[in-house]
Amino acid sequence: ERTMTKDNNLLGKFELSGIPPAPRGVPQIEVTFDIDANGILNVSAVDKATGKENKITITNDKGRLSKEEIDRMINEADRYKSEDEKQKNRICAKNSLESYVYSMKQSVEGDEMKDKISESDRKNRILSKCEETIRWMDNNQLAEKEEFEEKKSELEKVCMPIITAMNRAGGGVPSGMPGGMPGAGGGGGKGPTIEEVD
């Protein structure tokens, strides 16, 4: 019932290991939840690049809560709903900033853009602002949603004019750019796709 995993009842856990190192955002892990008619939960995770897989089966006797415990948790979920929503929005803003800064950094460090942006703009403006933002994030993990949004806006103000000028000069938008172009919906993404299977 709750947004944060720490506030829910743990039924079991497993680890998917052996994923090769890759740039942030590159690994794709497909997680599938399947509940059968008997209440047995099967969870599997597959690394799409390597095919490595792990799974767990949770029978309906593991981690069972009493009726009173379930009612208590539902009441807590209702009581903390607005706090949970605020926390969720804060984390989404943090993730959006983090995704944007690392995507921008990776894009301007890549070969595709090195020749299209001046060394001064690349190093002294974009990469410098990215590093400053990363340091700020490291020191402000518990910042509010508005603070994360403000930092993203500051970074976009530095990056947008340079990328726009590159586009006007015929450079085109590199494929790794967040949202196709900074500020164009970069960072948040669509989120997970959930498919229901009978």
From Swiss-Prot:
<dbReference type="InterPro" id="IPR029047">
    <property type="entry name" value="HSP70_peptide-bd_sf"/>
</dbReference>
<protein>
    <recommendedName>
        <fullName>Heat shock 70 kDa protein</fullName>
    </recommendedName>
</protein>
<keyword id="KW-0067">ATP-binding</keyword>
<dbReference type="GO" id="GO:0005524">
    <property type="term" value="F:ATP binding"/>
</dbReference>
<dbReference type="Pfam" id="PF00012">
    <property type="entry name" value="HSP70"/>
</dbReference>
<dbReference type="GO" id="GO:0140662">
    <property type="term" value="F:ATP-dependent protein folding chaperone"/>
</dbReference>
<dbReference type="InterPro" id="IPR013126">
    <property type="entry name" value="Hsp_70_fam"/>
</dbReference>
<comment type="similarity">
    <text>Belongs to the heat shock protein 70 family.</text>
</comment>
<feature type="region of interest" description="Disordered">
    <location>
        <begin position="170"/>
        <end position="198"/>
    </location>
</feature>
<dbReference type="InterPro" id="IPR029048">
    <property type="entry name" value="HSP70_C_sf"/>
</dbReference>
<feature type="compositionally biased region" description="Gly residues">
    <location>
        <begin position="170"/>
        <end position="191"/>
    </location>
</feature>
<keyword id="KW-0547">Nucleotide-binding</keyword>
<keyword id="KW-0346">Stress response</keyword>
